[in-house]
Regions:
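Positively charged n-region of N-terminal signal peptides that target proteins for export
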Residues: 1-4
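Extracellular beta-rich repeat passengers
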Residues: 504-777
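Phosphate/dinucleotide-binding and metal-coordinating scaffold of catalytic cores
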Residues: 12, 16-517
Length: 777
């Protein structure tokens, strides 16, 4: 009590003094937006603008400081949630090119452990969670500003995440920045949060993001005093190992369910699967042969990959890379984050809280030299990771790092990569010593019945009053532990979101969502798609599709027999292939099944995904999906696309790099052609009778159009959200607006159009743009 009183007396004086001393450097709260007008270069360098400094001034400075004092003086060694209140703030970003942006947002303290906050001289330095309400920073609106010492070696965090992204994994953009938070100047780690922006930057569609639900994780340690004793001395690892046995998963973006019934179904399916995987994990790390701490034992990659060999190897490589950078902390069950990739049917890891220290010979966040379980493909994964590390272009990596605030000579970059390889070799040696021992064989995946039994037994000890929510088709039931005394549970949509995000508490009682049919065998069920190999690609198709795939003719004919039935082609190469989709005619006022998406998250009647393509020909008629044709994450060239009579959009291309010689689209109820998140060279387009836009270009796309003819559309060509259009020849007839450029989403700039020859006939408006955009002739 005396300690708290001294702090409050000191800070009453400090608050008054600080308000005087940093009054001259405070951000003018009346300013908003950026001082530079949009240029083509701004959109070209949208994700790579160098940041000189980030400044944050909280409103209600006195209340903010008092809250921080309460965090510091709180008797627990962990920060309680009620002290993580949000405060309005002004944010200023100073870029190297001289641009200055004034943003608005809300900030709160971030971090569970007390190492996230400390006194620094006469001020406080702490980790922050920031949500922007106005503007973005390099396309990011939700981010963390970490104290420089809480995520491992700061430069290693930046290096690790950048390499992971180049290897095709999900990792947050991480930047070393100079920062000022109120009166405190410091170097900090800027890191985007796991959110929609992270997914789309990494060429993934928005979908469920999940993590470990820690509601019970701190239950047994929350009252341990904040003293000078170590966590080991007070028994924290032992207590948290016990509480981790009742740790399931939760959604971090449960608001997805607001988008519709199918989005809700996808989200519930994801959490159901991951709960089964967590239950298996928690029943395995301490069993008849195992006696591991929770942070030393990994989730089973066979389950996370839903038993797909290639995905298991990919996940093994991720685990090995984390271990090779001494980032074992990221592999502990309580620190795992995942994206449910509904198209490829597996849980993709999202790098989080890794604490890397590449130069060390051994990690400080594990007690073991070999982590169980090993998959049967572990040797193959080690070999592939070695190859990928050897193929890193260290000069390019050095240049990339400079945009992320890390200035490092190439020789030092090489040393980092070589040390990762040395660490990997050490891991391989330890693995070879134990891989044929009984313990390694014991920890290979084996089916386990009644995986809830272990959970119920431990929950009875950790939180005996907790209530479990199980699902039976569309109904929810509220049950006591062991799923006893269940009764129908009527819940509002807002409370359902709290439940799925692990935050539903009613009358001081924790509610835990467990799901439906928690049986590990359900993870291997194939779903409603059939599959057929075509050359080195795979065609997936639903019951309502009749498929003719002729590899000799290099031709795929798809006849749709049921409205809304879909087909998608995944991975591999399509060279000189012709694809014909013949849909079932439907009435415009009847909504098809699985609209606008299906359980895979697909919007196209025909979708082409993760393909290398050359001289492809596509014809699609009478589609009855959100998109007639959807091309995702594909590279190469298309000779011709013809689309006729689409229920909604005609062509939708996302996350791709394509040259298309000819596009002809007739009669789309919504847009004729959409292009987003990619680079597109379009030679000739003929778009007729488009219900909304002829061509829509968005989300950081760079598009070159040689010739385009649009007849009958609300907007001829729309360019938005940090996209660039180089338009050579256009004839736009019978439109409300010929050309439009605008900003639609907060995380982007406006659109930029550079036109040479544009003919605009029978249109109300030739040009329409907002203050964020530019059109030049």
């Amino acid at each position: 009590m005396k300690k708290i009183l001294v702090f409050f007396i000191f800070f009453q004086f400090f608050i008054s003094l600080s308000q005087i001393l940093f009054a001259d450097i405070k951000i003018n709260s009346k300013l908003s937006g950026c001082i530079h007008k949009l240029t083509k270069k701004d959109n070209l360098n949208f994700y790579n603008s160098k940041i000189n400094k980030i400044e944050i001034d909280t409103h209600n400075y006195k209340d903010w400081t008092v809250n921080n004092i309460r965090i510091i003086t709180n008797n627990s060694r962990f920060t309680p949630n009620h002290l993580k209140k949000r405060f309005d703030a002004d944010i200023k970003v100073i870029y190297e090119d001289g641009n200055i942006c004034y943003l608005k947002g809300r900030v709160r303290h971030s971090g569970d452990a007390k190492d996230h906050i400390a006194l620094k001289g006469n001020s406080i330095i702490q980790s922050l969670d920031v949500t922007l309400s106005l503007g973005n920073i390099r396309g990011i609106t939700r981010f963390k500003l970490f104290k420089p010492d809480v995520r491992g070696v700061l430069e290693d965090v930046v290096i690790q995440n950048h390499i992971l992204r180049n290897f095709g994994y999900l990792a947050p953009r991480s930047i070393k920045v100079k920062a000022r938070v109120n009166e405190t100047q410091s170097i900090m780690l800027f890191q985007e949060k796991a959110a929609k922006e992270l997914l789309e930057f990494n060429s993934r569609r928005e979908g469920p993001i999940l993590e470990a639900d820690q509601k019970f994780f701190f239950e047994l340690v929350k009252n341990i005093p904040d003293n000078n004793l170590s966590n080991w001395s007070v028994g924290t690892p032992i207590l948290r190992t016990k509480s981790s046995k009742v740790m399931l998963s939760k959604l971090t973006n449960a608001n997805l369910i607001y988008k519709g019934d199918i989005h809700e179904k996808i989200s519930l399916d994801a959490i159901n699967k991951l709960n089964s995987i967590f239950l298996y994990w928690s029943s395995r790390f301490q069993d008849e042969k195992n006696n591991f701490y929770f942070f030393d034992y990994d989730l089973d990659n066979s389950l996370l990959a839903l038993f797909d060999k290639n995905k298991i190897i990919k996940l093994d490589i991720y685990n090995l890379f984390m271990q090779s950078t001494n980032s074992h902390h990221a592999l502990g069950g309580s620190n795992r984050k995942f994206y449910w990739n509904s198209i490829e049917n597996y849980f993709e890891p999202i790098a989080y809280d890794a604490n890397p220290d590449i130069s060390r010979n051994f990690s400080t966040t594990t007690t073991l030299k070999a982590r169980y379980p090993f998959s049967i493909f572990y040797d193959e994964a080690i070999k592939k990771l070695n190859e990928e590390l050897s193929n890193i272009n260290t000069r390019k990596l050095k240049n990339d790092l400079s945009f992320l605030g890390i200035i490092m000579p190439e020789e030092a970059v090489k040393e980092k990569i070589n040390k990762i390889k040395v660490n990997l070799d050490f891991i391989n040696q330890n693995y070879n010593k134990v891989k044929n021992q009984d313990l390694a064989l014991h920890n290979q995946y084996k089916y386990k019945e009644n995986i809830l039994e272990h959970f119920n037994k431990n929950l009875k000890e950790v939180d005996p009053k907790a209530l479990l929510i199980k699902r039976n088709n569309s109904d929810l039931f509220k049950c006591e532990i062991y799923l006893k005394n269940c009764e129908l549970f009527d819940i509002s949509e807002s409370d359902l979101i709290k439940l799925l995000e692990g935050e539903l508490v009613i009358k001081n009682t924790n509610y835990q969502y467990v799901g439906q049919n928690l049986d590990l065998n359900a993870l291997s069920q194939k779903g409603n798609y059939y599959s057929k190999k075509f050359l080195n690609s795979t065609i997936f198709y639903e019951k309502g599709i009749v498929l003719e795939a002729d590899q000799i003719k290099n031709e795929i004919i798809i006849n749709q027999k049921e409205v809304g039935a879909r087909v998608y082609i995944l991975n591999g190469n399509l060279i000189d292939t012709a694809i014909f989709f013949n849909g079932v005619e439907t009435f415009a006022n009847i909504e098809p099944q699985n609209y606008p998406i299906d359980i895979k998250g697909l919007t196209g009647c025909l979708s082409l995904i993760n393909l290398e393509i050359e001289n492809l020909k596509i014809s699609a008629t009478n589609s009855n999906c959100e998109d007639a044709v959807n091309v995702i994450n594909s590279r190469g060239s298309i000779k011709k696309i013809f689309i006729g009579n689409s229920y909604s959009d005609g062509l939708d291309v996302d996350f791709s790099d394509l040259k298309i010689d000819e596009i002809e689209i007739l009669n789309s109820v919504n847009d004729c052609a959409d292009f987003s998140y990619g680079n597109y060279k379009l030679m000739n387009l003929k778009l007729n009778n488009c219900g909304d836009k002829g061509a829509s270009l968005g989300e950081t796309s760079t598009v070159e159009i040689n010739n385009i003819n649009v007849n009958d559309a609300k907007i001829g060509i729309a360019t938005k959200d940090s996209s660039i259009l180089n338009l050579k020849n256009a004839i736009l007839i019978n439109t409300d607006t010929c050309l439009a450029a605008y900003k639609k989403k907060q995380e982007f700039n406006g659109g930029f159009i550079e036109g040479k020859k544009v003919v605009c006939k029978n249109s109300f408006t030739k040009i329409k743009k907002d203050i964020y955009s530019k059109i030049i002739f």
